[in-house]
Amino acid sequence: MDLKVLKSEIFEHLNNKIIPFWEELKDENNGGYISYVGFDLKPDPYAPKGLVLTSRILWFFSRLYNQLRKEEFINFADHSYKFLIKSFLDKENKGFYWMVDYKGEPIDKRKHLYGQAFVLYGLSEYYKATQKKESLDLALEIYKIIEEVCKNDVGYKEEFDEKWNPKENIIVSEYGIICERSMNTLLHILEAYTNLFTATYDQSIKKKIEDLIILFKEKIYDSKTNHLYVFFDKKMNPIIDAISYGHDIEATWLIDEALRYIDNNKLIKEMSEINLKIAEKVLEEAFESGSLLNERVRGIVDKNRIWWVQAEALVGFLNAYQKSKLDKFLKAVFELWEFIKDFLVDKRAQGEWFWKLDENYIPSPMPEVDLWKCPYHNGRMCLEVIKRI
């Protein structure tokens, strides 16, 4: 395989597999998109609709239009945007609810920074596609809330009630602990700010991007292991022995993307070198049989192959190859794509990607769509490959 063949195959996969799957889920009766498809590929039109999935679908169709320029994609983005504003937006207290029922009535009014970040990411992309001032105004309102309500002197508070009173950070916590701060949420704030900056070129946002990159360099990156810490206390001290290989490799290319828009040459050089070290460590430690292991927690390695981890690994290793010209990264890209085609893509006519494979590559009976299983990772993988090659 060479890069031209890779690009051609991924373009075909995006257009013939991923896009039609998500277009089919447009909910014409209740708004938004059907938010649950079981392992049996049966959609549940009565399933609750989540902020993360709704925002990611908005981002996906907006980015499709911005990159591939097909008018149909705007219609699908509009559909997601209208439901997001009608059902998730808290007009009284501002911000967006975590979850609504299938008709759009709020059933979980918590505000989580992770969810607000994806609203910001989606609205910024939608504004680029449509130039609708309302969408940009909302994006800037969310940005202002994040900076004025969530931020403190050592990072960002993450979970709140509907009136923005801080709560225990339950939504993104794992491994039997409750964290105050998470690398995952901070990464998606950086990602969202980068997208907002490229929609506005507001210089104040550029400064916040730089501050977040410094936070990654000084508090989140572990120079002893070349991994990223996962969970922190409120002072940004790491609180668990855990490595998320998927987040490590995803962070390398998202941070490299953010580095393009700051002016601090010393930071650009240092962080770019760190990102390459992280990519090399992930390749060395977690790349096995053409695919990426999931995580290591308290010394125990989880060898399941998760859909989003493989998608982010392909982009991350392609980015590392384009920076370094080291053949080992390109080899990993080609092997990952073969693995994805052979094992992760659901070859049933109505299927998309399996959520998870066990260490023998047998699909786990998990949904193909739910509040987290979305077109953001694998759809973006396709779009990044098409853009970069």
UniProtKB/Swiss-Prot annotation:
Record's keyword annotation contains Isomerase: yes
Source organism (scientific name): Dictyoglomus turgidum (strain DSM 6724 / Z-1310)
PANTHER family tied to this protein: N-ACYLGLUCOSAMINE-2-EPIMERASE
Segments passing through the bilayer: none
Activity dependence on pH, as recorded: Optimum pH is 7.0.
Keyword Isomerase: yes
Keywords (A to Z) from UniProt: Isomerase
Family: Belongs to the cellobiose 2-epimerase family.
Catalytic activity reported: D-cellobiose = beta-D-glucosyl-(1->4)-D-mannopyranose
Function according to Swiss-Prot or TrEMBL: Catalyzes the reversible epimerization of cellobiose to 4-O-beta-D-glucopyranosyl-D-mannose (Glc-Man). Catalyzes epimerization but also isomerization for beta-1,4- and alpha-1,4-gluco-oligosaccharides. Can use cellobiose, lactose, cellotriose, maltose and maltotriose.
Complexes and interactors: Monomer.
Name of the protein: Cellobiose 2-epimerase
Reported temperature dependence: Optimum temperature is 70 degrees Celsius.
Gene Ontology molecular function: cellobiose epimerase activity; N-acylglucosamine 2-epimerase activity
Example of a GO biological process term: N-acetylmannosamine metabolic process
InterPro entries hit by this protein: 6-hairpin_glycosidase_sf, 6hp_glycosidase-like_sf, AGE/CE, Cellobiose_2_epim
Pfam families per UniProt: GlcNAc_2-epim
